[in-house]
Every structure is written in C-alpha cells, then in structure tokens.
UniProtKB/Swiss-Prot annotation:
Protein name in the entry: Vacuolar protein sorting-associated protein 27
InterPro entries: ENTH_VHS, HGS/VPS27, UIM_dom, VHS_dom, Vps27_GAT-like, Znf_FYVE, Znf_FYVE-rel, Znf_FYVE_PHD
Source species of the chain: Eremothecium gossypii (strain ATCC 10895 / CBS 109.51 / FGSC 9923 / NRRL Y-1056)
Domain remarks in the Swiss-Prot or TrEMBL record: The FYVE domain is involved in the binding to phosphatidylinositol 3-phosphate (PtdIns(3)P) which is required for the association to endosomal membranes. Both IUM domains are necessary for efficient binding to ubiquitin.
Places the protein is found: Endosome membrane
GO cellular component terms given for this protein: endosome membrane; ESCRT-0 complex; vacuolar membrane
C-alpha cells in the first residue's frame, strides 16, 4: 500500500490527482488509480469512507463530462480491485441510486461514453451477484432500468465466468476474536498479548506471529505482521516460483544446444549398453529421453549414489563369475565338483535374493517418502509445473520400480498376520481345554479326599463299634467319678413296678458310658450290623443321651424317673384343687393331702 494514503483526506487528494482535468479524453492516471484501489482493498481505510470519497468526486465533476468520465473509470477500477467488503458498500442504495441516475440518461454526443460505462458496470454487477442476498439491490436497479427501456450490452457465452473472475480480488480477511492463540492455544494475558494476522485475519500470540511480509496481492506493499502458517505458504510459493524461473531459463536455451546434449547422452547410453551386451549377452532397448535437459545441478545425489552402488554390485558379480570359470578351466578333471559348486552357491544366494526382492532398502524408502512429500507440495501448483519437474518424474520412475516389491512385501505381511491370528486362536482354544482339564482334575482330587475320610454312623442302632475290654480302667473309672449311680426309692403302691424298672435303668446307666466312650475312638472303626435281640432290648429300655452336659444332668435324671411319675395318687375332692403361683409353675393339691404324699412330691 502507498504510504501517502493513510487518511480519508489523503485518499481524496489522490482521487483528485488520478482524475485531474489536465488528463485529456477522460483518462485516468493508472498508477494513482491502482494506489487508490490498493488503499481500498487493504482495509487501512473504511470501505464506506472510501465509497463516499469516490461519490463526492463524481458529484463534483458533473459540469465537466471528461472529468466525470474519468471519475467513473476510477470507480470501475476500485470496484474490480477493492474486494468484497468494498463491493457491499458500492451495491448499497446510497451509491447505486447515483449510478442509476447516470445510466438512465439518454445517450448524446457528449455523454455517450459515460452512459455506456455506467450501464456496463451495472450489468456486470447484476450478472455476477444476482443470486447474492447481500447485494440484492443491484437486481432491483437492473429491473427498474429494464422497465424504463434501457438497453444493456449483450452477454457472450462465457461472459458470466469472466465476470465472476473480474470481481474476484483477494482482500485481507475479517479479523476474528478469541481468548487463546489459534496455533498453540495459549490463553492471552497481560504479558502474552494478542496479535492479528494481516493475511488470514486470525489471532495469535507473539511467538507465532513474529514474521513480517509484504502482501502485494492484497494491496499491502509494506511488510506487515503475519502468522506462521501464512509465512510458510509464502515461502513455499517463493521456492516454487524460483524453480519455475530456472526451468523457463532452461527452456529458453537454443534448440541446437539442447539437441547436441541429447545426442551426446544417447551416444553414451548406446556405448554402455554395447559393452554390457558383450559381457552379459543382454539386448536392452534404448529409448530416447524426452526430459534430457536436466543439468548436473538438478540431479539427485542419492540417486547417483544408488546407481553407482548397483554398478559396483554388477561388477563384483561379473568378477565372481569370471573366477569360477577360470577355476573350472584350470581343473577339468573334477567336473562333478565344478557342477556342484554353482548349485551350492545358487542355493546359498537364493534366500538372499528372495530377501532382497521382498524387502526395500533405506534408499528406496527415502525415495518413496520424498516423492510423497513432493506430490503433496505440488497439489496447488499449475499443471505445467508438474509436467516440467524432472526431479518428480525421476522419482516417479524409481518409485514405480519398487511397486512389485511393495506388493510382495504387503502380501507376505498379510500372510504372516493371518498365520499369527490363527496361532492365537489355536492357543486360546488350547488354553481353554487345558483349564477345563485342570479344573476336572482338581475336582476329582477333592472328591477322592472327601470319600477317604471316615464318617460316623448317622443311626446309632444300625452300626456297632467294636467294644474294648470291660476291664479297661479308662472306660469305667471316669464315668464312675462323674456320674454317680442314681438311687431309687420304692413306694407302697408301686413296689412291683419299681422293682421291674430298676434293673433296666441300672443296665442303661452302666452300658451307656461304655458305648459313648467307644463312639469317640476313630481308629479301628469297623461297622457291624447289630443283632435283632439287642436292638429290641435297646429300643425297649430307656437310654440317656451320649455324654450329657453338666447343666442338663437334672433334666436327664427327670427323664430317667419318668416311670415313677406315673404313681397313682389318691383322689381328693375337686373343690379343694388350686392353681399354683407363677413362681412355682406347677399344679399343687389342697391342704387335705397327707404328709407322706407331700414328702413324695418334694422328692419328685
């Protein structure tokens, strides 16, 4: 941008000088007109202020048709180079009404060019922006003029495309606001200040917007602040333009010189192929190189190193073959060994050759990555730059040669992957089967341990322990100390019953401790089926529970004396029976009972 146009007043002065009366035939000063359009496009001045400055100059020059024609020509230059923000102001009612008034005039000898120019500007704006809702007022003006019978120029078949490109001028983007940098996302603070990129309009921190570049395509000729992304794009375009310039210089060389170089290169290739034909009996095809104008500076050093390495390998192979042939000629008496030696060498070299075929070298991998990067960078380049880039074509040929090996390596990798997947599935199945077998084995071990443990009989009358000798003091003495023999008293009315019950009770009290003691011994346990007589005797005689606790001994004695409680007491009058109190918890008789019966009740 011109440094003189910094204010609206400076813009007005520049507009007056660009449309000066001293310029004949309504022409304008093109340099000043471009400065005005750059000032409008660079957004240094407001779009509305710029529009009003142009309108002011148009209204001032009504009396002079040549000056007014120059003013409208300056308006046309600014409209086509001012950017979208300026087009919105030009297509507003404030400016379009003035243009409609001029276009609606009848053509005369003096104003024919002026009226034709205004009509053409309106028609171009209508054709380009008739579907734009923000610039809809242009369509209204066009319809009103058509209703008045104004004739507009006829549109050619490709006129719409050309018109759209005519108003497509790049302008600085609108500034956006944010609380953090759009690259590093660091929040803005008092120290970390925000800066706007003059190219893309984004907001960035000082670290990512420290570059300064002029933006002539946006009307900014002095260096301004740009972000890192815009700076990288500028550098890429700069390097690509240099490469295109070198290529154009090479194409500008004399045609005879290029043909001489092609002939020399073709002659050298033919000589090298003739030498290789005499050695290896190979007949390669010779093709004419179309892009042979590449200079030594453009050759890839990595490619040259790879070619030299392949030539050295070929030479070593020829030397080995020559040595083998000389050894075979020197020892003709050993034909079998001479025949077996190449086969052994071939068998050793077969895996190496297969490995070389299925794998890529580091140089080939670098070539593939370099080719991919170049293709990615040349997406935005024109088609001529892609076709004329010799380095890209050389890399394409080299990468194309590695395609079979890439496919072979990819298939091999897929095969290995599928094999590993199958092996993983088999291992999973085997592990599940092994876990099942292990659980079954552990379950069998637990069951066998449970079945091997001795169990006491649940029915004491079904099995009988082997009795120990009755003379053993360990079975009789402890019970005699802890369980004294109970004494039973006879009564007058039930002496016979007591006499019958006493032997059974004594037998039960003597045999129960022995049986209880024998039931505790685990070793030597041999269950036997008891005899029917013993079973009937045991069932008919009352028995005590095994090893009764001390607190339950009185209850057991009561159970043993149950037959005594069946003594028939004499009947007494019913009206003298009384209920016992809660403290006694039993029924008592009236005072008419005898002292002997009271004593008997107390003993019970």
């Amino acid at each position: 941008m011109n440094t003189e146009i910094q204010t609206v007043a400076a813009l007005g002065e520049c507009i007056q000088r660009a449309t000066s009366e001293s310029i004949p035939n309504g022409e304008i000063d093109l340099a000043l007109a471009l400065d005005v359009s750059d000032a409008v496009r660079s957004r240094r001045l407001g779009a509305r202020d710029s529009m009003r400055a142009l309108k002011k100059r148009v209204l001032q020059t009504k009396s002079n048709p040549n000056t007014q024609l120059a003013a409208w020509r300056l308006v046309e230059v600014c409209v086509k180079n001012g950017g979208t923000h300026f087009l919105k102001e030009v297509c507003s009612r404030e400016f379009m009404d003035c243009m409609e008034h001029v276009a609606a005039q009848e053509k005369t000898v003096d104003n024919e060019d002026l009226v034709q120019l205004c009509r053409r500007i309106i028609f171009e704006l209508y054709t380009a922006f008739k579907n734009d809702s923000q610039l809809s007022y242009v369509s209204q003006v066009h319809q009103r003029l058509q209703a008045r019978g104004v004739e507009f120029p006829q549109a050619a078949p490709g006129y719409l495309v050309n018109t759209m490109a005519m108003f497509d001028s790049k302008a600085p983007a609108d500034w956006v606001d944010s609380d953090a940098c759009m690259i590093c996302s660091n929040a803005f603070t008092f120290l970390n200040r925000k800066h706007h990129c003059r190219s893309c309009g984004g907001i960035f921190c000082n670290e990512h917007s420290s570059h300064q570049l002029p933006l002539p395509e946006m009307g900014i000729t002095e260096p301004v602040r740009v972000c890192d992304n815009c700076y990288d794009e500028y550098e890429i375009k700069k390097h690509s333009s240099r490469r295109l310039r070198r290529q154009s210089q090479r194409r500008a060389r004399p045609k005879a010189e290029r043909e001489d170089e092609d002939d020399d290169l073709r002659r050298a290739i033919e000589l090298s192929l003739r030498e290789s034909k005499t050695q290896d009996n190979l007949v390669p095809t010779v093709t004419r190189l179309e892009n042979s104008d590449a200079t030594k500076d453009d050759e890839d050093p990595e490619f040259l190193a790879a070619v030299q390495a392949s030539l050295r390998e070929h030479q070593l192979e020829q030397e080995r073959q020559a040595a083998a042939a000389a050894a075979a000629a020197k020892h003709p008496s050993q034909p079998e060994r001479a025949v077996q030696l190449p086969s052994l060498m071939d068998s050793r070299q077969a895996p190496v050759a297969q490995q070389r075929y299925s794998t890529l070298t580091n140089q080939e991998e670098d070539d593939i990555y370099l080719f991919a990067n170049l293709v990615e960078k040349m997406k935005g380049q024109p088609m001529n730059a892609v076709l004329e880039d010799t380095q890209l074509q050389m890399l394409y040929q080299k990468v194309l040669g590695t395609r079979p090996r890439l496919n072979h390596s990819l298939n091999d990798t897929f095969h290995k992957y599928n094999t590993l997947v199958d092996m993983n599935a088999k291992i999973s199945d085997i592990m599940s089967i092994y876990d099942t077998m292990l659980e079954r084995q552990l379950r069998n071990i637990n069951l066998s341990q449970q079945y091997s443990m001795p169990h006491l009989p649940s029915d004491p009358y079904t099995y009988q322990m082997h009795r120990q000798p009755e003379s053993s003091p360990a079975n009789t003495v402890p019970y005699e100390k802890t369980q004294p023999e109970p004494t039973y008293r006879s009564y007058a009315r039930s002496s016979s019953n007591a006499a019958e019950l006493t032997p059974a009770i004594l037998h039960t009290t003597q045999s129960s401790p022995m049986e209880n003691r024998q039931s505790q011994s685990v070793t030597g346990f041999e269950p036997q089926v008891s005899e029917p007589d013993i079973k009937k005797t045991l069932l008919s005689s009352p028995s005590e529970p095994l090893y009764p606790p001390e607190e339950s001994i009185p209850d057991k004695e009561k159970e043993a004396q149950v037959p005594i409680t069946q003594f028939e007491f004499p009947s007494v009058p019913a009206q003298k029976i009384k209920m016992a109190t809660p403290q006694n918890e039993r029924v008592t008789e009236d005072a008419g009972t005898t002292p002997q019966e009271e004593t008997l009740l107390i003993e019970l």
